[in-house]
Amino acid sequence: MTDHTPALQRPATRTARLSAIEQALLTRIVTSQSQLSQILADQGIEVTQATLSRDLDEIHATKTRLADGTVAYAVGKQNIDEHPASNPDAKTEQQISRVLSGLVTSVAAARNLVVVHTPSGAAQYVASVIDKQPIEGVLGTIAGDDTVMVICSEDDVAKRRAQWLLDVASKA
């Protein structure tokens, strides 16, 4: 399956760079700073080794030995058995299911959008959880008080993601 997600355009800011680094570590197996530097360069982000080292420290990235023996960078609570590059769907579903199971009241697709209804006051939290996961075809979210709009790259992606969100929310 080909990923039709348009490339994100990032401003040349420290915050955007940190976000790009974190996203790279969450979605790929990165074994060295030079590899990470190249990934960032491919996104138009030039960074020195010293800056990259400080950035990795700031986002609390650590080197972790994967199940196959490879040593790679990990962010947050990733562990050896849950590296997203080896099993992205299971990890993503598990994390999202914990939140969505009690907070999603309905889901509907409309063109390239998915509309998610929540109890009053929960939409911002649900949107944040969705935004933090590397979900193929999802560009981002917008949240109000009780409604989240998930912006997808294409209409058919929105239909699949709506069903997926409904399935994940129903797992409790």
Curated annotation (Swiss-Prot):
Coiled-coil features, chain-numbered ranges: none
GO cellular component: cytoplasm
MF-aspect GO terms: arginine binding; DNA binding; DNA-binding transcription factor activity
UniProt cross-references to Gene3D superfamilies, sorted A to Z: 3.30.1360.40, Winged helix-like DNA-binding domain superfamily/Winged helix DNA-binding domain
Keyword Amino-acid biosynthesis annotated: yes
The entry's keywords: Amino-acid biosynthesis, Arginine biosynthesis, Cytoplasm, DNA-binding, Repressor, Transcription, Transcription regulation
Biochemical pathway: Amino-acid biosynthesis; L-arginine biosynthesis [regulation]
GO biological process, one term: L-arginine biosynthetic process
Signal peptide: none
Location of the protein in the cell: Cytoplasm
Purpose of the protein: Regulates arginine biosynthesis genes.
Family per similarity comment: Belongs to the ArgR family.
Listed name of the protein: Arginine repressor
